[in-house]
Amino acid sequence: VWDMIKEHYSILFCSLTGNTKKLADAIYETLPKDKCDYFGTNDSQVPQSDVCYIGFWTDKGNADQKTLELLSKLKNKKIFLFGTAGFGGSDAYFEKILGQVKQSIDASNTVIGEYMCQGKMPQAVRDRYVKMKEQPDHMPNLDLLIANFDRALSHPDKKDLDKLRELVRG
């Protein structure tokens, strides 16, 4: 097992609604500050650190475009993936997303950890579902989508962040 306390690291993230930034903050608070080479948003610059914590938001079952671009440029890095998705409640769903994301990672890299949790969505999403329900021939699963939206409102919560911190500590 490599020692994450001794190695220099960078934390790069894309966060559309602030959910993934919460995860990034939790990682930053957990690791030794003096070993941090970079903490901030992903501007697609390849970090110098050997260890990279890469955070994304989910877009159509994969990481956002900016994150995928960065991942495809990384070589010989130790990568810890973390992300949020509006739809939650199923580890299998998160596994599927992470599987997609990992296809953009070069074989010279090692994925040393991965974590995903649900993240709240903008109110406009719920409003759209409610509007769609008013149509006579609406999708049958709208009630489920609205229930999922409401469940997501509290996430990432303390439990989500604690679980991530535990993984990062190793």
What are these regions (language model features)?
Residues D37-Q48:
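Short acidic low-complexity segments
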Residues I5-T30:
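N-terminal beta1-alpha1 ligand-phosphate binding loop
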Residues I5-E7, T30-D34, S49-I54, D59-G170:
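FMN-binding flavodoxin-like domain, especially the glycine-rich phosphate-binding loop
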